[in-house]
Amino acid sequence: MPLNTIPNKGLTSRGYPSDRLVTPIIINGDMSVAQRGTSFSSMSNGQFITDRFFYDRAGLGITAAFTGSQSTDVPTGTSFANSIKMDVTTAQTLGSSGGTYLGVTTKVEGYNYKLISNQKGTISFWVKSNLTGTYSIVFRNNGNDRVLVEEYTIDSANTW
């Protein structure tokens, strides 16, 4: 399931692919609601950046540090007004212990997930980084006993 090769058949005014067949199941995917604030220094595990999206980490020896904010840097040609911006203030050196992850997490509610249960689906998202490379998106259930990891590639730095 290569996430970076979804054909672009145009975008709706909300920035979603125009050929989608169902309503998006990710709540606040446009990052427009940020009731807890819009800028955070020294992000702690579980801290929300915008509503429904939070900094998530697990593993031994995590020394990474981030600031997080609701940003107005968005892809051109969409009607998105906001995005999430994470700035690394202390980089993480990964050891051999495994099981370490750092990222932004959102949870799909059960009633929304039920709309796509046992069906093929597509996830589309915008990403921008000052570093090129291969990254991962992870899907997991609440019990952490079912996990799907898919890779995506950022080929060009500082572009959406």
What are these regions (language model features)?
Residues 2-160:
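Extracellular and organelle-lumenal recognition/adhesion modules and their flexible linkers in secreted
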